[in-house]
Amino acid sequence: MQERYQPNSVEAAAQQTWQARDAYLVHEHAKNPDGSEKPKFYACSMLPYPSGKLHMGHVRNYTINDMMARQLRMRGYNVLMPMGWDAFGMPAENAAIKSKVPPAKWTYDNIAYMKKQMKAMGLAIDWSREMCACDPKYYKWNQWLFLKMLEKGIAYRKTQVVNWDPVDQTVLANEQVIDGRGWRSGAPVEKREIPGYYLRITDYAEELLDQVSTNLPGWPERVRLMQENWIGKSEGLRFAFPHRIAGADGKLIQDGKLYVFTTRADTIMGVTFCAVAPEHPLATHAAQSNPALAAFVEQCKLGGTTEAEMATREKEGMPTGLTVTHPLTGAEIDVWVGNYVLMTYGDGAVMGVPAHDERDFAFARKYGLPIRQVVALEGKTYSTDAWQEWYGDKQAGRTVNSGKYDGLAYQAAVDTIAADLAAQGLGEKQTTWRLRDWGISRQRYWGTPIPIIHCADCGPVPVPEQDLPVVLPDDLIPDGSGNPLAKNEAFLSCSCPRCGKPARRETDTMDTFVDSSWYFMRYTSPDNDQAMVDARNDYWMPMDQYIGGIEHAVLHLLYARFWTKVMRDLSLLNFDEPFTKLLCQGMVLNHIYSRKTPQGGIEYFWPEEVDNVYDAKGAIVGAKLQRDGSEVNYGGVGTMSKSKNNGVDPQSLIDTLGADTARLFVMFASPPEQTLEWSDSGVEGANRFLRRLWALGYAQREAVGRGLATGADWAQAPAPVKELRREVYGLLKQADYDYQRIQYNTVVSACMKMLNAIDDAPLPEGPAADAARAETLGLLLRVLYPVVPHITWHLWQDLGYAEHLGDLLDAPWPHVDEAALVADEIELMLQVNGKLRGSIRVAAKAPKEDIERIAAAQEEVARFLEGRPPKRVIVVPGKLVNVVG
C-alpha cells in the first residue's frame, strides 16, 4: 500500500477494475444467492444535452443519483442507473453554422468527451443501455408513435397563430418565449399563421390534473403546484354578445355572436366594452376600412403569444367602430382590439368589466371608458380614482346596480345569470383549461423528421410503418438561412405511398421535448428493434426516483406524463404515471464579478482574476482585478454560467484533486434539494478529509490485518473498545437514516465524525483493539463508499477487507449492532440544589440506591452543601441526579 494518497492512480485503478468486470451491467429479475428475486429500483437523472463539457450542476445531479444507486445496491436492490443524450436541438445547428461542420459530428464529438468525463467521475452507469436522441434507432419510435397518434386523432394538423423566432427561423412553444424574446436567440418574437402538427394533450387535461394530487405524493409540493397551475382548470360561463355585423359576403360574422368566457359571471352587468384579439374576425373586418386600425393590428403581431408576455406587456387598444349587444340589458357595447387578448385562448375575445378587473380598470382609465360598479362590500366605498384589492373580491361581495340580480352573493349570481342566458340560447356553464394542445412542428433541420409525405393529389399522407425510420441526412451543414432540409432534393423527393406519383417529404421536424418524453422507457428495452418497449419496461417502470432541476417542473415533466398516458391507451404499458418520486436538486452557485464596458456592455471576470474587498464583518463588498488593481463590482452569488465567467470546470478539478474530492464536496456542502454555493476552501477541506482517511488506513494497516484475521469477543473487550464501537455504530445508525431521507450532506457529516472517533480513540494494544480498528474502519469504508467509491474501494482492497469479506462492489450494507449501542456505563448530570455542578459515571444498570450513594460522595456535593448532610437525592433515570441539602 502506498503511503500517500494519489487520487489519479487510485481512481484509474478502480475504474479499470470496474470496467473489466462490467460492474454495473444490470439484468432484469436478478436473484439473491438463495434464489429469491431482488427488489428492483430504477433511479435516473434527467438526460443531458451534449453541449461539450459537463458543468458542476451535472456533477451534483449525477453524484446524487450515483450515491443512491450504490447504497441501494448494497441494500440488496437490483438497481438500474442508465444514461443517454438529448442530442437534437438548435444549439447543434448554431454550432454547425459557426464551425461549418455537420451537427451530427459536433454532437457525437461532444458525447464522446462528456461520456469520458462521466466515466472519470466513477458513475455506476449501465452503458449497455445508452440511448441517443439523434440515432435513427431511437427516433424511429418517435415517428412510429406519431403515426399511431394520427390514427387515433391525438395528432392532427392545423393552421394557427404561433410564436415565430425570426432569427432561428422556427416556431416557439409559449414556454420558449421569455419576456417577448426567443429563449435561445433572444430575438423579438413575432406572430405568424403557420400550419403544423399538434398533439391533443388537452384531451388528457382532467386526468393530468387529477393525478397530480392523487398519484404523485413523492413529488415536491411546489412542482405539483406548478403543474396544477399550468394545466389551469377554470369553471365559468361561455356566453355571447349578439350583433348584426355582416362580412363582405353579406353573412353575419360568426353567426352574429361574439362569444367570451368568464369566471366572473356575477359582474356581467358591469360590462362597458369588449376586446378582441388582433386576429379575430371582427378585428379583420373592421381593419379593412380603417388604415389606422390595420396598422395597429400589424403592430400587435410583433409580440409573442404567451400568457406571461401578455401579463407584462403594456395594455394597448384601439376602437373598431363596431358594437355588440349586451345579452341581458340590450345596451350597445363598443368593441375594441386589445393587444393583450390571445386568439388561441378561448374565443379570442374578452368582456371588459373595469370596475372589478384590475387589467380592465387600467385599460378603461387609459382610454376614458365607463367604469360601472356592480359588486359591493359592506363598509367599503367604491372610487374610480385608483384600483383597490377588494374590487376583485368575489367571496364577500354582493351584486349592486344589477337590476333583478341585486343583492346576490357570487355563486347565486352566477347560477341565476347563467340560467337566464341559457334560456335565451346565449350561454352555458363551461370548464376551460389554460393548457393548450402541444404544437410539435419545428422549422429546423436537427430534429426527428415528421413522417408525412405531401402529394399534390392526395394531400398529407403518413409514411407507411414499414418505411420507418425516415432518416435525417446527417451530413448537412446549416447556413442560418432557414431549414436546410427544404433545400435538399435527396431528402425531399419521394413517391406518394397512396398513388405512387412524385411527392415531397415534410421538412418540419419534431419539438425536441418529444425526444425527452419517453427516453427513460427506452433504457429498459434498448436493443429491441421490433418494438418501442417490451416486457422489460413493465419490470422497471414506473421509475422509482427521478432526479433533475426545477426548471423542468412544467414542460418536460408534463409532456412525459402525457406521453406515458398515450402509450398506456395504446396498450404499450400498464401504468398511469412515469415517475414515482421526484427530487429537484438545487443549483450550484458561485460569485459574480463584473463592470460596465465603455461601449455600455457588461464584462464579467473569473473569481480567480480578482481579490475580494471585505467590510468589518467579513462580508464581500467589492473586488479588485489582480492584474491592475482596478475596481470591479461584486454581484453576489448566482447560478454558474459560461456567460458570467463564474463556472468551475469539473475536469480541471478531477485532474488535480480527483473525482472523489469533487463528489465529496458537492454532497457535503448542502442538502441535495437546496442551492450549493461554491467554495474553494470547501473543496480543499474535502480533499483534506480524503487524505486523512488514506493516512488512517495506512497507519492502521497492520492492526486491521490482525483484526480481520482474529476477531474479538466484544463482551470481554476493554471499555475504550466498547466506547469506540458504541460511537461508530451510533453514527452508522444516523447515516443509515439519512441515506433513506436522501439527506446526503448529513451522511458525509456522520462519516467525518466516524473518522475522528476512529483516529482519536485511545485504544490499548491487543486483539480486541485490532478487531475494533478493523471493524470500525470497515464500517466507515462501507458507509462512505457510495459518496467516494474510488478511495474506499482501493482501501478496502489494500487493507485486506476484500480477502476476508469480498469485493466492496458486492458488499452488503452494514447492520447496526444494537448490543454495541448499550453502554456499560452512563454519564449523569450532577446537580446540587437544582444547579449543575458536574457529572458522574455509573453502571448502566446501577440501582437507585447506588446512584444516590455515589452522588452524595462527590466532592462538589460536599463543597456546595458546606458540609451539611443531604436531605434527599432525586434521580432522573438516564439523565441526572439532584442532591438537595
Swiss-Prot record:
Stored SUPFAM superfamilies: Anticodon-binding domain of a subclass of class I aminoacyl-tRNA synthetases (SSF47323), Nucleotidylyl transferase (SSF52374), ValRS/IleRS/LeuRS editing domain (SSF50677)
GO cellular component annotations of the record: cytosol
Enzyme Commission numbers on file: 6.1.1.4
Subcellular location: Cytoplasm
Motif ('KMSKS' region) on chain: 639-643
Residues annotated for ATP binding in this entry: K642
Keywords attached to this entry: Aminoacyl-tRNA synthetase, ATP-binding, Cytoplasm, Ligase, Nucleotide-binding, Protein biosynthesis
Substrates-to-products reaction catalysed: tRNA(Leu) + L-leucine + ATP = L-leucyl-tRNA(Leu) + AMP + diphosphate
UniProt record, GO biological process: leucyl-tRNA aminoacylation
GO MF entries: aminoacyl-tRNA deacylase activity; ATP binding; leucine-tRNA ligase activity
Positions of short motif 'HIGH' region: 48-58
Source taxon at top rank: Bacteria
Disulfide bonds: none
CDD domains in the record: Anticodon_Ia_Leu_BEm, LeuRS_core
Primary subcellular site in the record, as a coarse category: cytoplasm
UniProt xrefs under Gene3D superfamilies: 2.20.28.290, 3.10.20.590, HUPs (3.40.50.620), Isoleucyl-tRNA Synthetase, Domain 1 (1.10.730.10)
Short name of any one Pfam family annotated for the protein: tRNA-synt_1_2
Alphabetical list of PANTHER family matching this protein: LEUCINE--TRNA LIGASE, MITOCHONDRIAL, LEUCYL-TRNA SYNTHETASE
Assigned protein family: Belongs to the class-I aminoacyl-tRNA synthetase family.
NCBIfam families cross-referenced by the UniProt entry: leuS_bact
Name the record gives this protein: Leucine--tRNA ligase
Phylogenetic placement of the source organism: Bacteria, Pseudomonadati, Pseudomonadota, Betaproteobacteria, Burkholderiales
